[in-house]
């Protein structure tokens, strides 16, 4: 779960 959340944030950056 956490990994997916961080992945989404990284995509935005």
UniProtKB/Swiss-Prot annotation:
Keywords: Amidation, Amphibian defense peptide, Antibiotic, Antimicrobial, Immunity, Innate immunity, Secreted. GO terms for biological process: defense response to bacterium; innate immune response. The modification Leucine amide is found at residue 13. It comes from the Eukaryota. GO terms for cellular component: extracellular region. Expressed by the skin glands. It is found in: Secreted. Signal peptide: none annotated. Belongs to the frog skin active peptide (FSAP) family. Temporin subfamily. Antimicrobial peptide. This is Temporin-1Tt. It comes from Rana temporaria (European common frog). The lineage of its organism: Eukaryota, Metazoa, Chordata, Craniata, Vertebrata.
């Amino acid at each position: 779960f956490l990994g997916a959340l961080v992945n989404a944030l990284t995509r935005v950056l």
